[in-house]
Amino acid sequence: MEGDGVPWGSEPVSGPGPGGGGGMIRELCRGFGRYRRYLGRLRQNLRETQKFFRDIKCSHNHTCLSSLTGGGGAERGPAGDVAETGLQAGQLSCISFPPKEEKYLQQIVDCLPCILILGQDCNVKCQLLNLLLGVQVLPTTKLGSEESCKLRRLRFTYGTQTRVSLALPGQYELVHTLVAHQGNWETIPEEDLEVQENNEDAAHVLAELEVTMHHALLQEVDVVVAPCQGLRPTVDVLGDLVNDFLPVITYALHKDELSERDEQELQEIRKYFSFPVFFFKVPKLGSEIIDSSTKRMESERSLLYRQLIDLGYLSSSHWNCGAPGQDTKAQSMLVEQSEKLRHLSTFSHQVLQTRLVDAAKALNLVHCHCLDIFINQAFDMQRDLQITPKRLEYTRKKENELYESLMNIANRKQEEMKDMIVETLNTMKEELLDDATNMEFKDVIVPENGEPVGTREIKCCIRQIQELIISRLNQAVANKLISSVDYLRESFVGTLERCLQSLEKSQDVSVHITSNYLKQILNAAYHVEVTFHSGSSVTRMLWEQIKQIIQRITWVSPPAITLEWKRKVAQEAIESLSASKLAKSICSQFRTRLNSSHEAFAASLRQLEAGHSGRLEKTEDLWLRVRKDHAPRLARLSLESRSLQDVLLHRKPKLGQELGRGQYGVVYLCDNWGGHFPCALKSVVPPDEKHWNDLALEFHYMRSLPKHERLVDLHGSVIDYNYGGGSSIAVLLIMERLHRDLYTGLKAGLTLETRLQIALDVVEGIRFLHSQGLVHRDIKLKNVLLDKQNRAKITDLGFCKPEAMMSGSIVGTPIHMAPELFTGKYDNSVDVYAFGILFWYICSGSVKLPEAFERCASKDHLWNNVRRGARPERLPVFDEECWQLMEACWDGDPLKRPLLGIVQPMLQGIMDRLCKSNSEQPNRGLDDST
């Protein structure tokens, strides 16, 4: 309901009090408005981040569903049936928004700021509100004793007209007639501010008085005056408030010291909350502004100051007047001079900035963590795509070698096996006879008095003697045969098993089953145990021979089963064995089992290969999505969150003199930013989405790199949404500023020793990039910067990418580009090639183009010549070893280029030799260009 009082205008009216200047209100409005703008950007980034993770989850679930339902029509088997599901589950499920961080960030973007006024009593709280608004809106006369005070919670918010109403916080307005509704008023009537003692309505007691005003400050932030302690404890008020608001807490003081009750209240606030507090000593009504230099003021201030230090709100290292410090974290302030209420804008800025910086940092950590996972997975997927086919081929080759070796053994060792069987029989004969003599028959009742038994019992006894001889003989022959091929089993089977284990790594359970089955076949095939089953030719041969013995023995008369009889049966069975036939049979069976196992192995390997083929196809698809969609999209969000953090901490940099222009940006001088001096600022306006993504990934790689003395430092980034008068969005990259680039240095003239040291510095920088998995792809004169001591640093990582994230795009500077760059299939050896060209310039001491390149009329002409083998010419000043190093580096075959770990000591040796010899014999090989 509207009151009849005169409404405040859009411009706040400055009251007579010492704190109510329009300047302070403008500063507060500017600070809270800035917070709202940056909070909006944070909210937008969080919303897009949540959408990104939802899209990843949907993609994961969709792929899993299509895999389980057999979509796509791909060939499936035990190895590939659920391989796609396993692939996605293993590589996408770990990419998710951590619930704790998401909840924290969502709470921050949902909470708008408010100024909360606490104080020693209700009068001083009302007085501070009037000072803040610059108008006398609340009565400052005594509302009653502090113990009997019933001031309800007050909320001041923006509206086009002045309006006073009762409402439950965050719920609905109460229908209640207020005194303010009944006539004109200058200050809100005391009756409306207090909870009436005789009112038993719980809703009425909990309700807050909501005042809407047309006021500049309230357009940006609500102001809440806490109820008196007797009505509701401050801790409870804060607890309700922090769920929906970010409180900027002010504490109004009017006494020279804190009472015991004040200290208890502040201790509880500090115990349950971590918010800083702005303590302000409100001047007494009607008093003049007290000279801050008086000793009385100093002593009073120091008493409050000491109390707040004891309570942990202030630190002895911070000046209590509220002057802003260098800390990024907001600190509590004590302002005892009423004319310095303007420091509230500094305090609120610190509180709001701390909140935003912490949130931006937390969000950026989520981005960077998931981005690193993407990049690591890209490496794993790329390696999987490269190594799995090689492993399968290696497994097939090694198994075939093992099969042929064992087959050769079976073919050529028949005579050896015959001799081995004869030797084994001779060695074991007595042992076998003794074992047969002492043998206890199963399922045959032998009369103890030596009476003859029937033919059936005789046959059973002879069969058991036969089985004993066969089992013992088989075991002995097998042991000797195994020892003859054991070295093959160790060298081949062990290697094969290790290779199979690598093939099953990171695969689904179904692939594990296939690989385990394959290993079982492998062990069964090559663990050479020569056992003769009842259907084998060896057993049939032995059985025929022993049947003849039975016929000779049994058809005369049924014998008595005595020790002598058992020995005689065993003797005749052993003597009737043919070693040559037995050897031939063993080798034949060995070959049969080898063939069978070899075929089973090959079939199972084909099955595994089919499973891997389907899996690798899915891996390649996922690898492409990671490189072209997931990682760039997340990198852009990461760039935005990090740039928000940087602009909050260090503000937007000021552009100085233009230093140079490149293909995608302009480089400016920047005197000072973020504590770094001097700086270079590269302003990049990405023309399209692809360039945005490339820039974002470049920024991530640069920020992820540890600092290195051979790389130019990147200090930070800021996104300028109003670049060029608001016509475009630019990314401002703030970097270390160096003296000049190598191109300029060579034109000015550098000594031989300096040039060779620069070459060593460049190699060291490239080696570091390669050690981090990165490929620069654009090593050239202008991308090597020199400091004042002419030590080199590599810059412009615009084309720099991890090998696994390279799409095969043609990038770089034509004369420094390796031939394989044009095919789209290349690795970090392209940097070795580019260094070879750079080294040509370094050794020449000039920036003049090589003749082979200078004759080219166009880039296409140059590229065609490079592909056909055109290289820089040898200059007369070149040292032989330098020329050989150049030629090796720019070799057309990437595999023949030297590793930089070999190039570096070679360069050091060249430098030691030439520079030492130059001091004695000038101009020996290379000009000393000065």
UniProtKB/Swiss-Prot annotation:
Domain Protein kinase: 653-907
Active-site residues annotated for this sequence: D778 (proton acceptor)
Top-level EC class as recorded in UniProt: transferase
GO molecular function list: ATP binding; protein serine kinase activity; protein serine/threonine kinase activity; protein serine/threonine/tyrosine kinase activity; protein tyrosine kinase activity
Location of this chain's protein in the cell: Cytoplasm; Cell membrane; Apical cell membrane; Basolateral cell membrane
EC number from the UniProt entry: 2.7.12.1
Residue ranges the record marks as coiled coil: 190-216, 396-432
Chief location: cytoplasm
Keywords from the UniProt entry: ATP-binding, Cell junction, Cell membrane, Coiled coil, Cytoplasm, Kinase, Membrane, Nucleotide-binding, Serine/threonine-protein kinase, Transferase, Tyrosine-protein kinase
Segments of this protein annotated with the region Disordered: 1-22
Catalytic activity: L-seryl-[protein] + ATP = O-phospho-L-seryl-[protein] + ADP + H(+); L-threonyl-[protein] + ATP = O-phospho-L-threonyl-[protein] + ADP + H(+); L-tyrosyl-[protein] + ATP = O-phospho-L-tyrosyl-[protein] + ADP + H(+)
Compositionally biased tracts (Low complexity): 1-14
GO CC annotation: anchoring junction; apical plasma membrane; basolateral plasma membrane; cytoplasm
Physiological role: Acts as a positive regulator of ERK phosphorylation downstream of fibroblast growth factor-receptor activation. Involved in the regulation of both caspase-dependent apoptosis and caspase-independent cell death. In the skin, it plays a predominant role in suppressing caspase-dependent apoptosis in response to UV stress in a range of dermal cell types.
Name this protein carries in UniProt: Dual serine/threonine and tyrosine protein kinase
Native species: Pan troglodytes (Chimpanzee)
